[in-house]
Amino acid sequence: MDSTVTVSVRDARASDSDRLWIESVYRNYLDDLAPLNTGIFPVLGEVGHREPDQITRWFSDSTAFVLAIVKNSKPVGFAMVARGTSQPGRPPVDFRMAEFFIARSQRRLGIGRTAVQLIFNRFAGRWEITEYLRNPAAVSFWRRVVALYTQGNYQERIVNGEVRQMFQSGTAPRR
């Protein structure tokens, strides 16, 4: 990444323009997920599926943090960090990366890696990152950034077609 490029992460709830930007690129995010054909993500335009409803849920969920990923003061991506929930048979986690998106034109520039490091530092605790095994680009990205961030000190499991990385992040200065 160019050393003159500044990447930051900010609370998208604090800015109407960040929310509008996320709404404007949400369809691109769903397009990226569509080839996975998991059945979890509705087909665009499907009866009963309304994208604004999903975004409204994110912004009203008190257990989630909606973040704008910013390059040189302009949004280029978003992330949603969810508080972990205990699930039978799984180790407890404090945070999960529920959603993560970088605009296509901004990919492979180091922005995602930098944003992830900022997010992990901001939310100290036990993390779980989950990606579909059928999404090799996501698996490769998350393995690289988690290994770099943790210096290889993480656990990975493959369960039911999902790859899960679990690790401890650093001290959080603020949210």
Predicted regions span which residues?
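A short beta-loop-alpha structural element at the N-terminal edge
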Residues: 7-35
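Conserved GNAT-fold acetyl-CoA-binding loop/helix
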Residues: 30-55
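A short helix-loop-beta-strand connector motif used in the catalytic cores of GNAT acetyltransferases and
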Residues: 50-68
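Conserved beta-strand in the GNAT
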Residues: 68, 74-83, 96, 101
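A conserved beta-turn-beta hairpin within the catalytic core of GNAT-like acetyltransferases
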Residues: 85-97, 125
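A short, internal acetyl-CoA/4′-phosphopantetheine-binding micro-motif in the GNAT/acyltransferase core
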Residues: 97-108, 131-133
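Conserved acetyl-CoA-binding loop-helix of GNAT-fold acetyltransferases
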Residues: 102, 108-121
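Conserved beta-strand-loop-alpha-helix junction that forms the acyl-donor binding cleft
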Residues: 128-143, 147, 157-160
